[in-house]
């Protein structure tokens, strides 16, 4: 009997050591009320990921770009999971900024009508297209590279994906002729077109190609005690590059919880730098706005447990009421 007790104790100790050894995992969850981790959905808001083009890109080039993508969604999805989120209805749903004639032509052939078409666009000379995406640790770059490679290989439209500083930089590069195509957040696109927030005057020399998927506002932390946005008060938080789309999304969310920028210790970093700072313990949390799963968070999760902070329903509704660019969103448990 005494021997059996010794064996049982030994087995229990082995299990404890095994659990301790596995403590830092890739479990991206958000903490429940007890402070432990729970595999649950994360409620948040999202903005659209939109491809825009310079007005002088020829109609045939944009038609080839859009048609090649939407006629080959299964093959694209096999290369990147975001392909599964694309639909004709969502692609043609943008309002407030007119569509490029090449995109409108394809959508209308498929029986989907866009809200407005840019007059006088599409009359430039055909050439290879540079596609401004985003930083290497974001979804824009990864998915943009897949789209560029696929379109170039399956059509006469030749596209090269380039890294960039994100939405605002992409609009500026597009306006300056450095790129012909670009990814932008839907809210930043409208700010540019109307000369608001990030932009001192309207930027109107572009038109919509397609809205491809939703970009979730993801609040990431390695601290399980940060359970709500209110818990960010007094913490060191990365809120994106100063003046970026992420910055304004972060400010909107903080304001919804009656927090000002001065109520946190704000740092202004890219997705990749935010992930590195979280891993090194230099910051407490970070706002990352990108289609989930996002490379920066996935990579961070390989180094230890990370948590997504959920927005409660009342604050989601406040954000929806305050801005026409937000949509309620859910990041499913197990995404990371």
Protein language model annotation of sequence segments:
Residues 145-149, 160-201, 219, 227, ...:
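Pocket-flanking alpha-helical
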Residues 89-106, 126-154, 214-280:
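Bilobed "Venus flytrap"/periplasmic-binding protein-like clamshell domains
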Residues 130, 160-161, 180-185, 218-220, ...:
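Structural recognition of the beta-strand scaffold that forms the well-ordered cores
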Residues 1-40, 115-128:
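Short, low-complexity disordered leader/linker segments with a strong preference
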Residues 46-48, 126, 138, 156, ...:
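Extracytoplasmic
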Residues 99-102, 114, 154-163, 169, ...:
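N-terminal secretory/targeting leader peptides
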């Amino acid at each position: 009997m005494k021997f059996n007790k010794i064996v049982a104790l030994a087995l229990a100790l082995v299990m404890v050591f095994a659990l301790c050894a596995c403590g830092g995992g890739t479990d991206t969850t958000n903490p429940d009320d007890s402070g432990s981790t729970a595999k649950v959905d994360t409620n948040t808001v999202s903005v659209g990921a939109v491809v825009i083009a310079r007005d002088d890109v020829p109609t045939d080039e944009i038609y080839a770009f859009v048609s090649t993508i939407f006629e080959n969604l299964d093959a694209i999805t096999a290369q990147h999971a975001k392909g599964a989120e694309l639909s004709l209805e969502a692609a043609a749903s943008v309002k407030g900024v007119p569509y490029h004639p090449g995109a409108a032509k394809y959508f209308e052939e498929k029986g989907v009508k866009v809200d407005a078409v840019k007059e006088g666009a599409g009359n430039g000379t055909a050439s290879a297209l540079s596609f401004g995406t985003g930083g290497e640790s974001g979804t824009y770059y990864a998915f943009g590279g897949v789209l560029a490679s696929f379109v170039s290989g399956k059509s006469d439209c030749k596209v090269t994906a380039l890294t960039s500083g994100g939405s605002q930089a992409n609009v500026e590069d597009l306006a300056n002729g450095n790129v012909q195509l670009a990814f932008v957040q839907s809210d930043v696109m409208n700010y540019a077109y109307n000369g608001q927030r990030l932009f001192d005057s309207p930027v109107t020399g572009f038109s919509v190609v397609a809205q491809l998927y939703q970009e979730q506002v993801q609040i990431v932390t390695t601290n399980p005690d940060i359970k709500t946005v209110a818990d960010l008060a007094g913490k060191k938080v990365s809120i994106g590059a100063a003046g970026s789309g992420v910055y304004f999304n972060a400010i909107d969310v903080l304001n919804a919880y009656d927090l000002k920028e001065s109520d946190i210790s704000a740092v202004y970093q890219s997705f990749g730098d935010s992930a590195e700072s979280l891993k090194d313990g230099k910051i407490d949390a970070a706002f990352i706005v990108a289609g989930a799963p996002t490379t920066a968070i996935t990579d961070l999760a390989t180094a230890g447990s990370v948590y997504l902070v959920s927005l409660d329903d009342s604050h989601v509704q406040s954000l929806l009421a305050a801005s026409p660019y937000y949509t309620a969103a859910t990041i499913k448990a197990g995404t990371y």
